[in-house]
Amino acid sequence: MADQRKAALDNALRKIEKNFGKGSIMRMGDAADTKIATISSGSLAIDEALGVGGYPRGRIIEMYGPESSGKTTVALHAVAEVQRRGGTAAYIDAENALDPQYATALGVQINDLLLSQPDTGEQGLEIADALIASGAVDIVVVDSVAALVPRAEIEGEMGDTHVGLQARLMSQALRKLSGEINKTKTIAIFINQIREKVGVMFGNPETTPGGRALKFYSTIRMEIRRGEQLKNGTDVIGNRAKIKVVKNKVAPPFRKAEVDIMYGEGISKTGELLDMAVEKDLVNKSGAWYSYGNERIGQGRENAKQWFADHEDAMNELMNKVRVAYGMEPDEAPATKEGEPQQETIEEASSDK
């Protein structure tokens, strides 16, 4: 009986491969590498919260939160990280609000960034579809879902009602995009805003525009909220961003990260490095003093951050120690300064394209 079942299964597999091509069905363990390929988010704290050391390739990521919470900043750091590793990035700026100077300050090579500012939601999603289908783009950012206005709404009058148009548009687009994203191993980041449902008496009244489709298709959903202000004396120089991974299909969800977002600079890498190193006793904190190795590096958190900013070799050494301590792989991508040529280091991770 067992032999008959095995023969029937083998016959079915041969028939499927004949009709749909080799590789259309396989045993899961037959894949050359079952480990999930990732690209760093550009932030140690976010990489740790994601559970796999970065954003998984070939998956959809949704970032949502209130206004000025840091969503675009987090997405731009991912773009900069892809470019630093020699990859290609595209940005669909539906809000028409991308600041080239700020993007450059975050490490984005704007001369190499593919930018589109579409007139309608359909146009923006079709452009994203073409870029993803090419297999030559490593990351596509859509900023934002709420700004993907359907063509019928653009061409209509101000008072016209268009019930569910955007939700249908997103549902149709994601049905098509999800397969291509997985096949080409492209990271697709959708930035979204927050709305409030009217008349909700109990529970959370907050929701995100674009219907339910994006919630279902997303492998990771990140909630980004603004925390307390960061001050230098009386001057406000930045704010804390609180990030919660509310959905994660590749690691345990509900992990949290907090990062310093400095105005004009983006995420403070020295700040998150210092916090994570202290937590793992790689940097000693005694009172207000911080010590690394046998050297006292500063009194107060800001002075310790500045010491690492001034000592790049020590910072890179500690960064790899922290990654190992948190179960992540050391960063082997070369650190490039502004204006220096980038080296192709992303090709191995994208060899499945």
UniProtKB/Swiss-Prot annotation:
One of its GO terms (biological process) is DNA recombination. GO terms for molecular function: ATP binding; ATP hydrolysis activity; ATP-dependent DNA damage sensor activity; damaged DNA binding; single-stranded DNA binding. It comes from the Bacteria. Residues 329-353 are annotated as: Disordered. PROSITE patterns: RECA_1, RECA_2, RECA_3. It holds the Pfam family RecA_C. Gene3D superfamilies: P-loop containing nucleotide triphosphate hydrolases. GO terms for cellular component: cytosol. ATP binds at residues 65-72. Keywords: ATP-binding, Cytoplasm, DNA damage, DNA recombination, DNA repair, DNA-binding, Nucleotide-binding, SOS response. Signal peptide: none annotated. It is found in: Cytoplasm. InterPro entries: AAA+_ATPase, DNA_recomb/repair_RecA, DNA_recomb/repair_RecA_CS, P-loop_NTPase, RecA-like_C, RecA-like_N, RecA_ATP-bd, RecA_C_sf. HAMAP family: RecA. Can catalyze the hydrolysis of ATP in the presence of single-stranded DNA, the ATP-dependent uptake of single-stranded DNA by duplex DNA, and the ATP-dependent hybridization of homologous single-stranded DNAs. It interacts with LexA causing its activation and leading to its autocatalytic cleavage. Belongs to the RecA family. This is Protein RecA. The lineage of its organism: Bacteria, Bacillati, Bacillota, Bacilli, Lactobacillales.
